[in-house]
Curated annotation (Swiss-Prot):
Membrane topology summary: Multi-pass membrane protein
Name this protein carries in UniProt: Photosystem I reaction center subunit XI
SUPFAM superfamilies: Photosystem I reaction center subunit XI, PsaL (SSF81568)
Domain of life, source organism: Bacteria
Gene name linked to the record: psaL
Keyword annotations of the record: Membrane, Photosynthesis, Photosystem I, Thylakoid, Transmembrane, Transmembrane helix
UniProt keyword Transmembrane helix present: yes
Family of this protein: Belongs to the PsaL family.
Biological process (GO), any one: photosynthesis
Organism per entry: Thermosynechococcus vestitus (strain NIES-2133 / IAM M-273 / BP-1)
This protein's record includes keyword Transit peptide: no
Amino acid sequence: MAEELVKPYNGDPFVGHLSTPISDSGLVKTFIGNLPAYRQGLSPILRGLEVGMAHGYFLIGPWVKLGPLRDSDVANLGGLISGIALILVATACLAAYGLVSFQKGGSSSDPLKTSEGWSQFTAGFFVGAMGSAFVAFFLLENFSVVDGIMTGLFN
């Protein structure tokens, strides 16, 4: 039975990928195709902005709840500072990857595979991650107000 469900991708066993009912489903293909890394028509800076917004927003929570300042009054600020530090490190790593992977003046059909395109992606990532980290901090600091708005307290 497993032989019928799991087979080589496109019938080629040398690709190194298996076709399964999950990986070949239309839902999974649509989901992955809509991720910013694979979506058609996005400029590198918009890809970076979208990826950065997602990462900056979810980086703050673990630092607030699990970080060394989790039981203090300044846990949110500590989470913000730690998140900013991690965003700076990630941006430096993205920039270093772009410097060593793509040659200046190189041409490619994919703008993300050029030095200029990767630089734009990195800039977008930095702006998006920093912005969403500050949004997450603002929401955590003003949680009672936001909760009141959502539960209809101010109607």
